[in-house]
Curated annotation (Swiss-Prot):
Top-rank taxon, per record: Bacteria
Species per Swiss-Prot/TrEMBL record: Chlorobaculum thiosulfatiphilum
Residues binding bacteriochlorophyll a 1, per UniProt: 99
Subunit details: Homotrimer. Each subunit contains 7 molecules of bacteriochlorophyll a.
GO biological process: photosynthesis
Record's protein name: Bacteriochlorophyll a protein
One Pfam family hit: BChl_A
Binding of bacteriochlorophyll a 4, residues: 278
Length: 354
């Protein structure tokens, strides 16, 4: 069952509040491992003209009764048009162990292919990462004995666990890579782990892992870029924040998200504004796991427009209206939700004006 709510600000403001409550009755990615995870993220403008922001984040998780926490505060600014620089510090704790660290680095903005439906929503996006995680080749230098032992232990454990491949083969990853693979003309097949092995390099052994994904691949990258769309730096004239909680157990996954974002709507020309996307989309695009055909969704959406505004066009069509409050449920909306959950691009087109 899912409830979503979007409350929009008036005038030409792109800001809005987003609330999502979802209970997904599918086995989580780690079927036997109950997990709790809480995320708090604050983004504060320091000099919007230079894209200069301060990000504070706290990630807490409890997995198998062990509490893990990661705290980060970082200042990020544009160094050049192509490069952003980041300086920050943080602390990681696992159970009774904690470790403080600081970091400094730069990132080059990279671009990856997006479908026309997404491109229509976002005129000038900056994308992160490659197009999709398909046939990843990951090299990790193993430069001390502890790392080598850990790596070899992992390889042995995976190689000797009969159930590992069984449960992975038995589930479909439901996410946007379904579409990405179709667009790329690739056949959709089940997940295969091609192999994990160790090869020698000039400075000692190098861990190499080659994975082939079917449709779980691009979920996380796509999700991150979708969340990033909600944080356009040029509209960040006050602090933005998001608080989220994820609970998973053998019954499924429960999600709670509350956020105030600067990029909930965009100017669509002619006095119209477009709601950028449905809260379902970034959640689903983490790549959900479930039996592909056995998937039904009970979802509803509430959109609250600024006073005096009206919806001028809606696809899927809304079910009811009371002044500035519009509600979607069942019918075309339910079919649209199921389409998105099964990896469809799922264009969500809601235009509003005074």
């Amino acid at each position: 069952h899912r409830d979503y709510e979007i409350v929009l600000e008036g005038g030409s403001s792109s800001w809005g509040k987003v609330k999502a409550r979802a209970k997904v009755n599918v086995p989580p990615a780690s079927p036997l491992l109950p997990a709790d995870c809480n995320v708090k993220l604050n983004v504060k403008p320091l000099d919007p003209a230079k894209g200069f922001v301060r990000i504070s984040a706290v990630f807490e998780s409890i997995v198998d009764s062990t509490k893990n926490k990661l705290t980060i505060e970082a200042d990020i600014a544009n160094e050049t048009k192509e490069r952003r620089i980041s300086v920050g510090e943080g602390m990681v704790s696992v159970g009774g162990f904690s470790h403080s660290f600081s970091f400094e680095g730069s990132v080059v903005n990279m671009f990856y292919y997006r479908s026309d439906a997404v491109r229509r929503n976002v005129p000038n996006p900056i994308y992160r990462q490659g197009r999709q995680f398909h046939d990843i080749l990951m090299k990790v230098p193993l430069d001390n004995n502890d790392l080598i032992d850990t790596w070899e232990g992992t390889v042995r454990a995976i190689g000797s666990t009969g159930t590992f491949n069984d449960w992975i083969r038995d589930f479909w990853f439901i996410g946007p890579a379904f579409t990405a693979l179709n667009e790329g003309g690739q056949r959709i097949s089940r997940i295969e782990v091609n192999g994990l092995n160790t090869e020698s390099g000039p400075k000692g052994p190098v861990g190499v892992s080659r994975w082939r994904f079917s449709h779980g691949g691009s979920g996380m990258v796509d999700s991150i870029s979708r969340w990033a769309e909600l944080f356009p730096f040029d509209k960040l004239n006050r602090p933005a924040q998001v608080e989220a909680g994820f609970r998973s157990d053998s019954q499924g996954i429960e999600v709670k998200v509350d956020g105030e974002f600067p990029g909930v709507s965009v100017d669509a020309g002619g006095g119209l504004r477009r709601i950028l996307n449905h809260p379902l989309i970034p959640l689903v695009h983490h790549g959900m796991v479930g039996k592909f055909n056995n998937f039904n969704v009970d979802a509803q959406l509430k959109v609250v427009l600024p006073k005096g505004y009206k919806v001028r066009y809606a696809a899927p069509q809304y079910r009811s209206q009371n002044l500035e409050e519009y509600r979607w449920s069942g019918g075309a909306y339910a079919r649209w939700v199921e389409h998105v959950c099964k990896g469809g691009v799922g264009q969500f087109e809601v235009l509003y004006a005074q």
